[in-house]
Amino acid sequence: MSLAIAGTGWITPLGSGVDAVWHKLLDGHEAAATKISEQFRTRFYSVFRVPESALTTPASHPRLRRASLISRFAAAAGLEALRSAGITPDSQSAERIALVFAISNGGVIYTKRFYRDIVATGAQSASPLLFPETVFNAPASHVAAILGITGATYTLVGDGAVGILAIKMADDLMTNEELDYCLVVGAEEADWLLCDAYRRWRLLRLAPPIEPFAQLGRGMILSEGAGAVLLARVGRRRRADAKDDPVLIERTHPGGYYRKRAEAEEILKRILCDLSQTEIDFVISSANGTFIDLAECRALKQVTPNALVYTAKPALGESVGAAGLWQVVLAAQALRCGELPPLLRAEPTIPLRISASRIPVTTARHAIVLSCGVNQQAAGLRLRKAD
């Protein structure tokens, strides 16, 4: 089934709003890193945080007064996606909107606080206010309540590829004729504990920049934020966005799992082969400065050597749970606007079609979103700009 992207939402370290963030990427902006530390710890890590100004709209909602950052990011992105599609759920339409939430690390900040109190002073100190925020489906619950969505709600847990897998799930859900739309949201919050874990797995670098497709992967920088995509059946797009050429999700690929890093390249090749049955104009990659870059570079060079390649992670960081949705928003914007941003921090010797300056793609019709997570998942999808 081909689904139309009816609306998108973006909360990133470069701010909020799809158009605003898009223009910053086109201008070559790069998020500013913030140093974070932990009590009684001497090690500092760099992260790309979302500016407070990006969360002004939904933060006043009563349900979000004590909610975790990840829930606030998700609500803001979901609200923007609905607004961009001209949709305000009411008692009747809310039942015909499904929600699929993509998550990876979850609400780490509140979970850490909850268990720290227990360890410090005993089980009697466990906060009933914090506990609901420790479960993976807490952000989905907040988003559904705030946006007024009463249809089916699901939470999908995975790694950096989980956003693409969530869209695959939405594609399956939309075969139900009782649904008109499906809102797919992915979100992530950055914390010292996550940075320390990824460093121990030799996936993190202590300070920017992220160097994509480097021969020696020096690691990623974690970031936070959310992305949202509102999917509709072709023909159900509102007049509010009728002036734009619709972007369709032409095919979703379930991807696969790799046990060893050396196997990632073969899975990525298989995904690209299945999705490139038509001419592909550009690929939005998930290269983030880790082993993923080399695997994707080899797969892209072999299967789609003529396609332009771009990754936003040098500018935005690795947002894990939100990363896949960010890639889809990027691909849709590039097809609509006919332009790709400059690839930052890339060496000119990379054996792919890349550009260090913004490049027009006005005739582009097909794009692939390729997503490989660091925890053994890979997936992809193909977008098409409708005639």
Stretches with model-predicted labels:
Residues M1-A152, I164, D172-N176, A187, ...:
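Conserved "HGTGT" condensation-loop signature of ketosynthase/thiolase-family condensing enzymes
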Residues Y154-L156:
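Short beta-strand-to-loop elements that line the ligand-binding cleft
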Residues G160-V162:
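Catalytic nucleophile serine of serine hydrolases
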Residues M169:
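Internal active-site segments that recognize and position negatively charged phosphoryl groups
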Residues E178-D180:
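Alpha-to-beta junction loops
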